[in-house]
Amino acid sequence: MRKTFLAITCASLLSPTFYSQAQEVSADETVVVTANRFKQIDGAVLAQTVTVTKEDIKRLQANSLFDVFRTLPSVEVAQYGGRGQSASIYVRGGSSSQVLVLVDGVRMPRAIMGGIDFNQFPINSVERIDYIRGARASIYGSEAISGVINIITRAPINDDSGRVSAGYGSNNHKKGTFVVSKPVGEGKHFKGVLGYEKTDGFNVKPQPGLNDGDEHGFETLNLKLGYQQNFSDNLSGYVGVSAYNNEYDYDNSSIWSGHEKKTGEVEYVGTDLSLEYNKDVYSSELKLAYGQQDNYDHKSGQNKSTGDHVAIEQFNAIWLNSYSVNEELSIGGGLDYRTEKLAKGYIAPSDRGPAKDYDPEKNPRTNFGVSAIAQYAYDVWTLEASVRNDDNNQFGNNTTWQTAAGWSFYEGYELTLSHGTAFRAPSFVDLYYPGYEMPNLKPEESENTELSLSGAVSIVDWTVTGYYNEIENMLIWEGAGMQNVGEAEIKGVELEVKLDTDIVSHEFYLDYKDPVDKSGAEDTQLAYRSKRGAKWNAYATFDQWTLGSQYLYQGERFNGSTRLPSYSLWNFTASYAVNQNWDINAKLSNAFDKDYEMYVGYVTPGRQYFVSADYRF
């Protein structure tokens, strides 16, 4: 995994001034798309970020986004069992609904509860993952309280590759992928991905005498198609279509209702279209995207029509612009329109009936955002400021802002300081759960301050960051429904170190935080967040071999008065290049068969193996 100062974008807009600079920089410098929505040299970026490349994903031998995210700094992940089960991500102590997840710069349709279940998204189409920490609502709007993750599936227009892979592992885990990414003429490119995966799984929530012998498996079929074309030196376009159909089993047994095994199905279809214009000192992009996610819930073995059905529709229109005033000053701005609605079904299980005062056909949720940013770089100083206003038909106006400064006080060393505000809009369930409707809820709000020092000494690149995040109006369940009565305070320190020792590349991540829930009479630790974490990723390449290891330490966590002990995990990977076309791969996860819990009452995978073969063409 390559650590950079890379930030995230909703789209790939080019600042010509920085582009011309990029032609002259050395190979060690990187031209990146930043949180400012235009391209910059990495040294000009002030946000703390990491990029995961397609090559990194291959070295990890990741079968899911869960496998990737758990290796990132200041990230805690948890899932209700094994592959395909519902999963959550906690960035710097924030909740899953307080991190914004994008796909090719566009928001994923939100789950009914407001968070994104990234365990349902197929990893086989991913080209790169950009991960930024800290408040970015002044650029992106709602949910960007603790961080932003941009999952990029669009291939470079000059990419010429193809791959067929097949693998088998523990719990009868089978996986096959076909990928073609090829130029189809001058300035034209096509990418197609087809994938299938199935595992029998295991009993993720054993209840003796109720569900003995149950297995909770996962199955997915997914497709991704993309075409891009350069119409001229200045104008290019892209159109993409993606779809996946997932099924996962889970346990719904109880001592009151007896044994009940259920199946959840997730069907997603989305399409996006974009046009980019770049000329001299001006760049512009228009992007349109539509997605629908259907969620079915029914008893296992029965047809999906016999259970509950919920569908979320989302449409996005984004127009971004950037202008280089001179070599020191660049400005940018954007308009974002989004509409989302509950297209079918109920917000809650159908036996609760419809919510009061909510007709999804007559009252979709719409949001219009206007943002502006400026960055000034001169001598050893870099300054930036951004502001955004979101006008939402449910909760009204919300204005966020951020300022940052960077001081390169000595060659190879930089000190950065930033302060910004952020918010999260209530979800459909927060507002309209039948019998507990609270249509007047306000957004959660936060203020984040962070100070970073980075340096490069010989073979070592390092960064240490301290942050302080206050969150108010947190949505907490009270007897009558959700209420804006919660408050949290999260303080933390991160250390990132990257170095190469002979043939081995290392990445070390340490974090200490104090995630405090201040909502009650006494301060408590936020649920399922630990205070301490450590990660080590290492890879060695020699001859035809690539060997890897990943170490993860997770500190103790709490859910109310229940304590979940700390744990350590080791994963090992090996890949052998038979020739230029064939690779043989093997992975051993949880190598020492550690017994641990992510959620109370749910079993995690023990020692697991997975072997695969790749053919490249």
UniProtKB/Swiss-Prot annotation:
A motif (TonB C-terminal box) lies at residues 600-617. Keywords: Cell outer membrane, Ion transport, Membrane, Porin, Signal, TonB box, Transmembrane, Transmembrane beta strand, Transport. One of its GO terms (molecular function) is porin activity. A motif (TonB box) lies at residues 29-36. GO terms for cellular component: cell outer membrane; pore complex. Residues 1-22 form the signal peptide. Gene3D superfamilies: TonB-dependent receptor, beta-barrel domain, TonB-dependent receptor, plug domain. It is a multi-pass membrane protein. InterPro entries: B12_transptr_BtuB, Plug_dom, Plug_dom_sf, TonB-dep_rcpt-like, TonB-dep_rcpt_b-brl, TonB_box_CS, TonB_rcpt_b-brl_sf. It is found in: Cell outer membrane. GO terms for biological process: monoatomic ion transport. Residues 159-617 form the TBDR beta-barrel domain. Involved in the active translocation of vitamin B12 (cyanocobalamin) across the outer membrane to the periplasmic space. It derives its energy for transport by interacting with the trans-periplasmic membrane protein TonB. Belongs to the TonB-dependent receptor family. BtuB (TC 1.B.14.3.1) subfamily. This is Vitamin B12 transporter BtuB. It comes from Vibrio campbellii (strain ATCC BAA-1116). The lineage of its organism: Bacteria, Pseudomonadati, Pseudomonadota, Gammaproteobacteria, Vibrionales.
